[in-house]
Amino acid sequence: MYKRQVGITSNKEVTTRIINSLKKLEYRGYDSAGIATLKDGFINEVKCEGRVEALEKNILNTNIQGEIGIGLVRWATHGKPSTINDHPHSSEKVSVVHNGIIENSTILKKVLEKKGYAFKSQTDTEVIAHLVTD
């Protein structure tokens, strides 16, 4: 099984290490990349279509930092490649990257929508962020 995601927790800033790790995964093929970090209790994320190099440039413009972070290079299976569908998917309390297919995502999405959760993307992964928050 191969992975396209990275997670690092440290007592030092992790953004650069996550980007460097994502660059090592580029050979696997992907259509978008993203990163989320936790700093002072707040989740910050940056996502983009295209290469990790473009993500790195976007990060420089946002000054995203944190001692905990996740990242993913994504090959779309649900939802077209777009910034909205790119990973990570976050709620106020959790950020998720996922490689695979959530078979019952449609059912879970309907249950969560009845509880008042709003979905931004066309992906199955966003369900996890809301489900964990619930």
Please identify what each model-predicted range represents.
Residues 1:
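Active-site loops and adjacent core secondary-structure elements that bind or stabilize anionic groups
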Residues 4-134:
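Conserved short alpha-helical segments that host acidic/polar catalytic motifs at enzyme active sites
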